[in-house]
Amino acid sequence: MSEVGTFSKILVAIDGSETSLKAAEYGIEFAKKYNTQLIILHIIHIHAAGLMYTTESTFKQFIEKNKKESEEWFNAISKKAKEQGIEIKTETVEEIYSVPGAIIKRAEEENVDIIIIGSTGKSGFKKLLLGSVATDVVRYSKCPVFVIK
């Protein structure tokens, strides 16, 4: 981790929601300002209970649909980043248990200096100040978290 006020590596977690895509724009701006590495991460949340009631082909379709969707987001974000002279690393992770836990784990593995995340995701609870994923990332992350409204 870098010293306070400087960044060498930034992780932005996205789910395709308006606030997460806005977070990616902030990530690009931070990466440009601080000349840092930028990682864009999407977690595919696999609901464990749903696995019991689905076929293998349906499960594969679900994963492929989500990967295709995330590739579209990554491509749009990459295009904006390249226009700013920023190279990014993109990653999709499949997670059965905890989305916030998966975000924090990747942040720790990558030794990032800051996580940028949207305040609310695709769950539809727009009236909440902070969604459950953002709340848990803020609560349990060892590095600073920048939450975008």
Model-derived regions, located:
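Aromatic/hydrophobic pocket-lining residues that form π-stacking "cages" and hydrophobic walls in ligand
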Residues: G27, I77, I103, V137
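Generic structural signal for helix capping and beta-alpha/helix-loop junctions
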Residues: H47-A48, S98, G124
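Short glycine/serine/threonine/alanine-rich loop segments
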Residues: T36-Q37, I86, V112, C143
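Gly/Ser-rich helix-loop-strand patches that form or flank binding pockets
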Residues: E108-K149
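A short acidic, glycine-rich active-site loop
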Residues: T58-E72
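Structural beta-alpha unit
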Residues: M1, G5, K79-I115
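Small/aliphatic-rich secondary-structure junction motif
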Residues: E3-S57, K80-K82, K89
